[in-house]
Amino acid sequence: VTGALTAWSHYGSAEAFLLDDVRMAHLTRGDLAALDAADPLASFRDRFMLPEGVIYLDGNSLGPVPKATPGRVADVVAREWGNALIRAWTEHGWIDSPARVGDKIGRLIGAAPGSTVVADSTSVNLFKLLAAALDARPGRLVILTETGNFPTDLYMAQGLVALLGRGHALRVVDDPRGALGPDVAVLMLTHVNYRSGAMHDMAAMTHAAHAAGALVLWDLSHSAGAVPLQLAADDVDLAVGCGYKFLNGGPGAPAFLSVAPRLQAGLRLPLTGWLGHAEPFAFDPVYWPAAGIARAVVGTPPVLSLAALEVGVDLMLQAPVAELRAKSVRLADLFLTLVAQECADDGFAPLTPANASQRGSQVSFAHPDGYAIMQALIERGVIGDFRAPDALRFGLAPLYVRYVDVWDAVAVLHDVMRIGSWRDLRFQTRRSVT
């Protein structure tokens, strides 16, 4: 091992050290193993179920299983449900779980207490909040978003506009900030782009929308648990996000939504289910919305899924946000630099900004044969994913991804390209999930 730790400290930042061409040329796997040994987050890796022989770089699509999750879910089934039966709704706090877990997520995203609730899916929550935003801005008919936004965001807006049929429109532009105007009711943006990993300046975009009289709805699906967020400080109006990526809540984990306290009393939602009623067990035939964020709950909460999600969220809350972000930046800088160094002639075009302040916790590369290359990597134990038409994505969740994982992943990528294994016909057939 060379003096990597000392040199890193001397440079003042990981990115300055890693991107120094001279030092990078002499960096060894042993240097990175030393960095892993000194990593203040290293112990978190042991709290996840990670198969031997696998480098898991797809936590931006589905987080791995926290080791505490199976036991917690089994306890809910056998002890809470098994013994308390229907009494568990109150005795074990099931009925309060959307608000309880929501407030925990609220701490992760910097939202005010009582602003966040767990409910439904990201798509459904988008629909609910887009409809509420249009209702809150009568006379403004445009939902504004950007080219390349995640498809479900676009689909839900398209469906809502078609359903309303009152002259509303979805406007998709390359420069949403420049397109803000008096007809825009809500600016809908994804904070970290699903394909490239590029990240918006949340405070600046929110301020610009407010200056134009519009509300802002942020999709935090690739942000929550991955980058520092300050919804309250940035004066964010509305937000949604999913629970199965960086929050490690499990496949199909329920999503969350967040509404600024100043907007909650006037929030009129299009889905008015019984658990969003002011008195659900009064069984009033007329709907009256619950106070605050509770009105955003529609139906009976998925208790088992919420229990799994809560384990993942509790784990995230134990990790210092500053250390998470610092390591995320280092991992991405290392990955980008190693690919540029080891795969310079292999046709990989970085999609992810080199500037750490402009990206989330993933790196992506465009390649015309990206799908086949990713399948070849997966067969070799390096699990990332592919997004059409040509993007290879590598999620860098700092709770369990090590510096040596990045080194080893790029080494496998280099070898796959060197021997051309990705050309095998079995890697050409698209699976239903990519």
Feature-to-residue mapping (PLM):
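Pyridoxal 5′-phosphate
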Residues: 3-434
